[in-house]
Amino acid sequence: MIEDPYLGKYVTCVSARSTDKEILKKAQDGGIATALMVYALEEGFIDGTIVAGEGDKPWQPKPEVAMTREEILKARGTRYSISPQISWLKEATRSFGLDKVGVTGVCCQMQAVRKAQLYPINMRDVPGKVAFTVGLFCMENFPYKSLQSIVEDHANQSLGSVKKMEITKGKFWVYTERGNVATVPLKATHKYEQPGCHVCLDYVSNLADISTGSVGSPDGWSTVFIRTKVGNEIWSKAVADGMFETKPIEEVKPGLDLLRKLAKEKIEKNQKTVEERKTFGVNKGLRNPYA
C-alpha cells in the first residue's frame, strides 16, 4: 500500500481508458466511472448504482438509481453542479430493493458514505449494502444557478445548447452542439463556488474503492487510483477481461506531479479556511477526517 500526504492511500495508480466505444462517445475523458459501474453490474458485484442523472433543466443533475447498462450510460459525462447522491442510499435499498449498491460521487460524498458505514445513525442496515464506490477528482462544485451564470453570463452561451463542459488548463471550457468553444478564466468562477467546498481537504476521493479523474493523464485518458481490496478485485478482473486499456502512470505526461501539486494547493488553501473558521466557535465540526 502506497501512502501519500496529498493523494491518500492506494494500491496502484495507472492511466487508463475504456475499450467500449459506446461509452467513450459521450464520456468526459477515459470513461472510467461509467465503464466500471457497467462492468460491476454485469458481473454481479452490484445490483444497481446511484448516479447523477439528467434533471428537469439543462445540465441540472438529479440522483437516480440505475439498474441497467442503458440507465448507467444515460448518466455519462460530468455535470458541474451539485447532485445529492447520498440522499438516495435509503431509496436504493428500500424502494428499489438493492442489496449491493454502487455509488459514484465526488470527495465529500465518498466521505459521507464512509461516515454512514462507521456511524449508521438513522440508516439501520443501509450502509452494509454499499458494495462498491467510485470517487471523482474534485476541486470545487457549483450550485445550479451559479453554473447557469458562468455559462450564460460569462461564456455567453445558452445552457441548453451546451454538449460538454470541462475544467482544465486554468479555464472553464464550454462546448456547444454547433461547434462553438468558449472559455472562462477560473479566477472569474471562484465567487460562484459552493461555500462548503472551501473546507474540503480532499482532491482525489481518498476514501473511495477506486478514484478517477482527468488530471495527470493525456487527453482522452483518465488517472485511476485503486485504493481498496474491493476496488483491486473489480479493477483486476475488468482489466483481465479487456475492459480497459492501461499505461503505467510513470510513463504518461503530465503524470502524478501535476496531480499532487493541485491536491496540495487545494488542501493547504482549504486548511487555512478551516483554521479561520475555528475562531468562529465551530472547531468540532471541522475535524480533518484524513488526519
Swiss-Prot record:
Family assignment from sequence similarity: Belongs to the FrhB family.
Subunit structure: Pentamer of two alpha chains, two beta chains and a gamma chain.
PANTHER family: 7-HYDROXYMETHYL CHLOROPHYLL A REDUCTASE, CHLOROPLASTIC, FORMATE DEHYDROGENASE SUBUNIT BETA
Keyword Iron-sulfur: yes
Catalytic activity: oxidized coenzyme F420-(gamma-L-Glu)(n) + H2 + H(+) = reduced coenzyme F420-(gamma-L-Glu)(n)
Stated name of the protein: Coenzyme F420 hydrogenase subunit beta
Keywords assigned: Iron, Iron-sulfur, Metal-binding, Oxidoreductase
Pfam families in the cross-refs: FrhB_FdhB_C (PF04432), FrhB_FdhB_N (PF04422)
Residues spanning the membrane: none
Its biological purpose: Reduces the physiological low-potential two-electron acceptor coenzyme F420, and the artificial one-electron acceptor methylviologen.
